[in-house]
Amino acid sequence: MTKLITTVKEMQHIVKAAKRSGTTIGFIPTMGALHDGHLTMVRESVSTNDITIVSVFVNPLQFGPNEDFDAYPRQIDKDLELVSEVGADIVFHPAVEDMYPGELGIDVKVGPLADVLEGAKRPGHFDGVVTVVNKLFNIVMPDYAYFGKKDAQQLAIVEQMVKDFNHAVEIIGIDIVREADGLAKSSRNVYLTEQERQEAVHLSKSLLLAQALYQDGERQSKVIIDRVTEYLESHISGRIEEVAVYSYPQLVEQHEITGRIFISLAVKFSKARLIDNIIIGAE
């Protein structure tokens, strides 16, 4: 049965004891409202590590002034049940006051990796992500940490953070988990109307179009972006906020495509903003 830990002090006590005995720790940081994408990461950790820890913490630092922290879905009882079913050992669910007992004296700034894509639209968001992930890594001290490729910019930033701050953890990127029709699984999908849900499948279909163009030899980003945009405009009612091609993991905008690339989409429906991506090409 999965154990619920609610304080930093108790979590640190458990981790220190585990480390002394040579136990390997797998860690999945989340903000809760778990779905199959999260559970895939939990299963991967359970199959590899002696102990699997899942954090459920809605981090206020990564919410902007126009983003409703209080409205973010919280369902700790259901989350605990879900991860228990797939074998997680511990859910770490601290209070905000325990994670941030006072005003932070040191600000962590991400830099250029956060100046594009989602980071450009949400100033300070990735500073908040890096701050909380740093804290969680120091508390949990994982050997392996699992992040979804659906948030590919976040994954690239966390990998750079681990390198820059010498964290003794290996980051494992987990492929996007999709519904049977191709829609990327997301906590936000519940906010889609029935019509929007039918339209949302075209995000992944447009990425398959981009992949086909690339495989046919197209190397001009503008051609791919224009074709994807045209496809989306003819299939969805939501507002297309982004169709972009960047190098990966460097996140430099590409015009003439070389090497590994990241094609990113963002579409705003009435009550949900959906993102999706595909990473293609040689490293």
Curated annotation (Swiss-Prot):
Entry binding sites for ATP: 31-38, 148-151, 177, 185-188
EC annotation from Swiss-Prot or TrEMBL: 6.3.2.1
Subcellular location: Cytoplasm
Pfam families assigned to the protein according to its UniProt record, in alphabetical order: Pantoate_ligase
Pathway info: Cofactor biosynthesis; (R)-pantothenate biosynthesis; (R)-pantothenate from (R)-pantoate and beta-alanine: step 1/1
InterPro entries, alphabetized: Pantoate_ligase (IPR003721), Pantoate_ligase_C (IPR042176), Rossmann-like_a/b/a_fold (IPR014729)
Span of the signal peptide: none
A single BP term in Gene Ontology: pantothenate biosynthetic process
Membership in a protein family: Belongs to the pantothenate synthetase family.
Purpose of the protein: Catalyzes the condensation of pantoate with beta-alanine in an ATP-dependent reaction via a pantoyl-adenylate intermediate.
Binding partners and assembly: Homodimer.
Miscellaneous remark of the record: The reaction proceeds by a bi uni uni bi ping pong mechanism.
UniProt-recorded name of the protein: Pantothenate synthetase
Organism for this UniProt entry: Staphylococcus aureus (strain Newman)
